[in-house]
Amino acid sequence: MGLFDRLRGNDTPRVAFIGIDGLSHRLVADNPDTFPTLAAIADEGDGGPIDSAVPPESSACWPVLTSGVNPGETGVYGFQDREVGSYDTYVPMGRDVQATRVWDRATDAGLDATVMNVPVTFPPQRTVQRMVSGHLSPDVDKASHPDELREYLTESDYRLSVNAKLGHQEDKTEFIEQARETLDARAEAFNRYVEMDDWDLFVGVFSTPDRINHFLWGDYEDGGPYREDVLEFY
């Protein structure tokens, strides 16, 4: 049984938000056989290209996506922001997001939320039943709540992200292998807590596709040596 089958659950109303970071709508549209589930969702429901937030930087976009308001209200404009009234800079984290996130609305309404690997959520919030923070978090140990989640992720060699240094090497073999391992471990963790938790809202983000696209998209577009590796990864 796949992740999407597990998410269907019973008749109790609930919401699952699955993020696939960096996935191009054009890539799905041009390769429906590679993406049968997403292609079916687009055919039976809706799908299409979307415009990014302004500025189009990941650290600004994820708070926008999870709060529904623009950077002027989230207070996060990029990977590095400036302290008000000075030229000192800092890296925005979850505590710097000034807007209410969707899981905050759920918990405020007395609902249970499980949140996994969303960027710009460090440190993990103790107000939700389970959270592992995403990109820019220092390590799994500090990014996980509660203890059971921390212990499971540590024992299963769960990675918060792929080692980008590998992507800069001329031979991308090790980078691609680690990307696959990271994706598999994340899918396994998502499956575990989709089944284990009594959740009303599940939010999980696969960030590895974004890393693949950063380093291999040119090969896909131009017919480079790693073009087929991109499609095989997906």
Regions found by a protein language model. Give the residues of each.
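Acidic/polar loop patches that form or flank catalytic/metal-binding clefts of enzymes
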Residues: 48-51, 73
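Beta-strand elements within well-structured catalytic alpha/beta cores of enzymes
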Residues: 12-28, 41, 65, 106, ...
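His/Asp/Glu-rich, glycine-adjacent segments
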Residues: 70-227
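A short acidic, glycine-rich active-site loop
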Residues: 227-234
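Active-site-proximal N-terminal segment of extracellular/periplasmic enzymes that hydrolyze or transfer
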Residues: 1-49, 56
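Short Gly/Pro-enriched turn/cap motifs at secondary-structure boundaries
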Residues: 53-54, 93
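Glycine-rich loop at the start of a catalytic domain that most often binds anionic cofactors/ligands
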Residues: 60-70
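Generic recognition of stable, solvent-exposed alpha-helical segments in well-folded globular domains
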Residues: 18, 23, 33-36, 60, ...
